[in-house]
Amino acid sequence: MPINKRPSDEFIALLRKSGDADINVAAAAQREFAKALELPLRKGVLVGNILGNIFETINVEAGSTTEFPLDLVSPGLEGEHVAYTNPGHGRIPERSVEGDYVMIPTYSITSSVDYLLRYAREARWDIVGRAMQVMEAGFTKKMNDDGWHTLLAAGVDRNILVYDADATGGLFSKRLVSLMQTVMRRNSGGNSASVGRGRLTDMYVSPEALEDVRNWGLDQVDEVTRREIYTAAGDGAPITRIFGVNLHDLDELGEGQQYQDFFTNDLGGAVQASDLELVVGLDQSTSDSFVMPVKEQLQVFEDPALHRQQRAGYYGFAELGFGVLDNRRVILGSF
């Protein structure tokens, strides 16, 4: 609900009824109000986040298991699946393969918000709209953190950290992008013509890394690229792609920031000795690794227990989970 735009007259009337002195009228209006909020909140939670469409949403029926099959070929064993020269006699060798699976646990996430009934009676849609934004932000923040914690854990489990040994510590360089591309290719399995082979498509960096890009001189980029950096909009990366890799900036990445602290303090990871910041690279060329099973879509309900306190409130919950089926799609770097 945008707080700088007046909603429809029907919405204003429903908001007034939700604060009616008749508790039965208020309860019915609050129930209808909750359902009216459910769809826009659900859209906001699924779209307005920094997961950037990384995870594929998979709706799962209630009561069913969230099992996902893994690739028949395990990482590091690609070379064992070969053909043989047939000498013309004897039996053809047998090679049995059996796929494994992983079960991703789902869990419930909840949030709530309440405000004075007086705001409803006076149709203060700006205050109510802000309250709904706070509720949406609670869900979004939870999903952002859980999704990125899963990605970082997959990167740490891979036990590969790429860094540019020739660059100054704390300075983002083009060579780091190139090195991460090469390491991703070398460690993705298969050969040059393998189908679905991993490659670096997206890189997530801190705002300070983009500041380094803005300060690249003529010894780093040509004059045309310098012009593009100079005229780039302030709400995005100064260069959106380097060597075909999409650049994304996250406030949560950077020295002393939330996700880097999670990487070092909770996961026990560490950047290169002379480096300061973490970089996350992903392969999003295929949707075969990052999954978000959803067992129960976001639902919003009114809270009738708050009427005695002369307040109106709403709460919501959803059941979902996050998983990385193949950690070869994640690579970490530092600068």
Where does each model-flagged region fall?
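Alpha-helical scaffold segments that mediate packing/assembly in large oligomeric complexes
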Residues: 115-194, 334
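Sequence/fold signature of self-assembling virion shell proteins
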Residues: 2-5, 12, 216-335
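Broad gene-expression machinery/nucleic-acid interaction feature
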Residues: 108-112, 200, 311
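N-terminal alpha-helical "arm" segments
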Residues: 1-44
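Assembly/oligomerization interface modules of large self-assembling protein complexes
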Residues: 35-109
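Short, aliphatic-rich beta-strand segments
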Residues: 113-114, 206
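A contiguous, surface-oriented mixed alpha/beta subdomain in the mid-to-C-terminal portion of proteins
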Residues: 177, 181-248
